[in-house]
Amino acid sequence: MKRLTLLGSTGSIGVNTLKVVSRFCDRFSVEALCARGSVDTLAEQVQRFSPSLAVVIDAPTAQALKERLPAGSRTEVLFGEAGYCHAVSLPGVDMVVSAMVGAAGLGPTIAAIKAGKAVALANKEVLVMAGETVMALAAQKGVPLLPIDSEHSAIFQCLQGNDKTFLSKIHLTASGGPFLNKTRQEIETATPEQALAHPTWTMGKKISIDSATLMNKGLEVIEARFLFDVPADCIEVVVHPQSIIHSMVSYIDGSMMAQLSVPDMKGAIAYALSYPERLDLNQPAPDLAALEQLTFFSPDLDRFPCLGLAFEACRRKKTFPAVLNAANEVAVDAFLREAIPFGRIPRVIEQVLAEHTGVTDPSLSDIKDADAWARQRAGALLP
């Protein structure tokens, strides 16, 4: 029985993780559920999975959760980052699923690694912000980091049984998002409703907007750079609208390996939870004859400048990826609040990056300072 702490239990990845846990309740149990808010959903999860601990963002939310739990509930309720870090460090926990959105997941994920827990990583911002620090700490502690992102799971699977010294290139696939065939003018004036309507995946609001700008793919480039220890120039993005091939790797002999599956996050989640084994999800493999054709083409950086900004930050290293991430979070939040138009998102990020002086070999404190500076600066650029 593998015992789990789930960071971000009420989000899309969290909900799908609990579906996998429910299906394989003889193999997994839940020790702690952690969320920001979404009290009603979290209360339902607590009553269903009976964890020893539930953690939310602050004291009022904790009180609201307690009021929704039945009298005599065995689940302790804590709040704040200290609560999240306690949840990942519980002695009985074998694996932490890191699925919090954004920078909020960094501290708890580092705490999990320090506690020697295996980490199933869905929060790409953890590596975007502090990739070198996190990977070095994981190596020091002997802690496996298993990717949940479908693309990084695909790369991880394609690398199995192969010596990485023979790797030539990583090919990250992108669906192209809801604006794949839209003009630049149509993209710049898009509404939140239009940007949230992803053609392939059902996701949370923030990652849906990142998918619409292609910033999500840019963050995945940076994540891949650290997770697989390859330079930015060894990673390329290719648009693949069918989302059947989740990523590919090519080797120095000209061969290429790809991982295919129907678009369903439960596959990547189950693989991370059960690695090196595989679970029978009762999910059919892609019907190649029915697909008829799979298409690929290069992304248009003129219409989707966020991807180019992410590659730039990845190449510049230092604290630029952390600044990119922070400025993006602020700009996306402003767009969702309808404070800025969609086309303003990359311009805010570009200006913040242009004003930043990168810190070489940054400490965790340097990264947090850069994150805070970028949020303040991006906020100052908003109406």
Curated annotation (Swiss-Prot):
Q: Which residues bind 1-deoxy-D-xylulose 5-phosphate?
A: K124, S150, E151, S175, H198, S211, N216, K217, E220
Q: Which EC number(s) does the record attach to this protein?
A: 1.1.1.267
Domain of life assignment: Bacteria
Q: What family name appears in the similarity comment? A: Belongs to the DXR family.
List the Pfam families hit by this protein, alphabetically: DXP_redisom_C, DXP_reductoisom, DXPR_C
List the keywords (alphabetical): Isoprene biosynthesis, Manganese, Metal-binding, NADP, Oxidoreductase
GO MF annotations, alphabetized: 1-deoxy-D-xylulose-5-phosphate reductoisomerase activity; manganese ion binding; NADPH binding
Q: Which biological process, per GO, is one annotated for this protein?
A: isopentenyl diphosphate biosynthetic process, methylerythritol 4-phosphate pathway involved in terpenoid biosynthetic process
Cofactor(s) the record lists: Mg(2+); Mn(2+)
Residue positions annotated to bind Mn(2+) are: D149, E151, E220
Q: What does UniProt give as the signal peptide span? A: none
From the Swiss-Prot or TrEMBL record, give the protein name. 1-deoxy-D-xylulose 5-phosphate reductoisomerase
Q: In which pathway does it act?
A: Isoprenoid biosynthesis; isopentenyl diphosphate biosynthesis via DXP pathway; isopentenyl diphosphate from 1-deoxy-D-xylulose 5-phosphate: step 1/6
Q: Where does NADPH bind?
A: T10, G11, S12, I13, N123, E125, G204
Q: Which InterPro entries match?
A: DXP_reductoisomerase (IPR003821), DXP_reductoisomerase_C (IPR013644), DXP_reductoisomerase_N (IPR013512), DXPR_C (IPR026877), DXPR_C_sf (IPR036169), NAD(P)-bd_dom_sf (IPR036291)
